[in-house]
Amino acid sequence: MHGNSEMQKINQTSAMPEKTDVHWSGRFSVAPMLDWTDRHCRYFLRLLSRNTLLYTEMVTTGAIIHGKGDYLAYSEEEHPVALQLGGSDPAALAQCAKLAEARGYDEINLNVGCPSDRVQNGMFGACLMGNAQLVADCVKAMRDVVSIPVTVKTRIGIDDQDSYEFLCDFINTVSGKGECEMFIIHARKAWLSGLSPKENREIPPLDYPRVYQLKRDFPHLTMSINGGIKSLEEAKAHLQHMDGVMVGREAYQNPGILAAVDREIFGSSDTDADPVAVVRAMYPYIERELSQGTYLGHITRHMLGLFQGIPGARQWRRYLSENAHKAGADINVLEHALKLVADKR
């Protein structure tokens, strides 16, 4: 799928090459989020920021190798885009990494941070933190077969294995034996039992200073920080200590914060994306998807928070929530919802 003129108009910049270097884009990224960062969401977020590195939802190696659907599908406009893999079999991960590189992904990320039960049962996610050698083997197997970056997203500890020494040993093993050069650190530990994934994102306390210390102790590694970051001001404060910042829920629930990322984080001279123009720039994509059988609500559910903090935001959200799922719903639903915002502006 190729870019449309609306998208090019919004994302015009002379400072960055057409396919942004992933190391540069890693200064600011949107986290992989299950059920949220699907291809429709990523297309939408790309209209708000040209440079932000976007991540897929976690995709398991089993789904890619044995699944019937195309779990690697994405639009060319999404670049730079990284694939997050879930798995713990080095050979299967290597196979999937090769497929992903052939499809044009800019980075492969291994999930060593998700604490959900269904993930643990498949022996991947945060439970892998307890087996640093296996994580190293997985990363090395992927690095041996691809030339794009292979990164690891992890936590600062699991259960009672939460000492700084444990974290350093993990990073040491995965960077040394696994040759991993880039880590994204969620600044909380994970409880592998007793807490839901949602609770694991909220209850374990954030420890940003520990992540800063990790970067100081491993200056040769590229490290991004993740967890509880709610504004670009906070992101810029973290960038005083870290190579990159990854934002999760806030970028999804209040995507308008991405509109200023290119200027504030990447130094672009472009004007910030206008939310109304972004909605209308979605129309060609939406019409193409509708013609292929996608329901409007599957796309617009990612756009509900766009006008957060702007008069009319509640009416926008409510109208889309009540009408986008109806049979025959098309871009007229969005046009009507936009009028509700415009009337309040």
From Swiss-Prot:
One of its GO terms (cellular component) is cytosol. The record marks N111, K198, R201, R314, R317 as: Interacts with tRNA. GO terms for molecular function: flavin adenine dinucleotide binding; FMN binding; tRNA binding; tRNA dihydrouridine synthase activity; tRNA-dihydrouridine20 synthase activity; tRNA-dihydrouridine20a synthase activity. It comes from the Bacteria. The active site is at C114. FMN binds at P32, M33, L34, Q84, K153, H186, N226, G227, G228, G248, R249. Keywords: Flavoprotein, FMN, NADP, Oxidoreductase, RNA-binding, tRNA processing, tRNA-binding. It catalyses: 5,6-dihydrouridine(20) in tRNA + NADP(+) = uridine(20) in tRNA + NADPH + H(+); 5,6-dihydrouridine(20) in tRNA + NAD(+) = uridine(20) in tRNA + NADH + H(+); 5,6-dihydrouridine(20a) in tRNA + NADP(+) = uridine(20a) in tRNA + NADPH + H(+); 5,6-dihydrouridine(20a) in tRNA + NAD(+) = uridine(20a) in tRNA + NADH + H(+). DusB and DusC together account for about half of the 5,6-dihydrouridine modification observed in wild-type cellular tRNA, and DusA accounts for the other half. These three enzymes seem to act site-specifically on the tRNA D-loop and contain nonredundant catalytic functions in vivo. NCBIfam families: PRK11815.1 (NF008774), yjbN (TIGR00742). This is tRNA-dihydrouridine(20/20a) synthase.
